[in-house]
């Protein structure tokens, strides 16, 4: 888990918050299951935040499941969503959160994402210092061929990666 102070710094002045937990790995790791979602909700409300909606995705790292989990989050006028999963799950939530800021509650160490049955794509190295809350849900450590954290390298052209011009610059 991230230190609560770090999470609260990301949440900042947001008042209306949604929380998404993960029924799979994060539940098994006690970092984002129903118990932890309830604990975070209670903490946020004690800090004067309004937790408008919570949900549990079977797997936060599966886009199709996350889409269904986030349906109740739509039209709630949320200021942000907190993803209580691995960094990969937070990225899936961010892709489906209707452009709301999504903040990670955990510092993930490693993982990949199921693109389709039997095909996996590395999307998070669980580096232990998750920056997805600052990068719009894009992990520069895994999605940049050079793992740059300070912006594009000098070799990118027209928003394309220097190492593999087929890929967009992270």
Region spans (language model):
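Short secondary-structure subsegments characteristic of cysteine-rich extracellular domains
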Residues: 168-170
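Iron-sulfur-associated redox domains of electron-transfer enzymes in respiratory
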Residues: 1-156, 162-165
């Amino acid at each position: 888990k991230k230190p609560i102070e770090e999470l609260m710094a990301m949440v900042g002045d947001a008042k209306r918050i949604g929380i998404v937990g993960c029924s799979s790995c994060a539940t098994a790791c006690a970092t984002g299951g129903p118990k932890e979602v309830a604990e975070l909700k209670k903490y946020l409300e004690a800090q004067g935040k309004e937790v408008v909606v919570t949900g549990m995705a079977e797997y936060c790292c599966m886009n199709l499941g996350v889409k269904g989990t986030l349906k109740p989050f739509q039209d709630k006028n949320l200021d942000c969503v907190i993803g209580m999963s691995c960094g990969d799950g937070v990225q899936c939530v961010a892709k489906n959160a209707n452009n709301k800021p999504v903040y990670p509650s955990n510092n993930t160490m490693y993982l990949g994402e199921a693109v389709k049955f039997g095909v996996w794509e590395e999307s998070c190295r669980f580096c232990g210092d998750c920056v997805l809350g600052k990068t719009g849900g894009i992990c520069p450590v895994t999605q940049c061929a050079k793992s740059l954290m300070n912006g594009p390298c000098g070799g990118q052209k027209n928003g394309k990666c220097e190492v593999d011009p087929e890929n967009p610059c992270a």
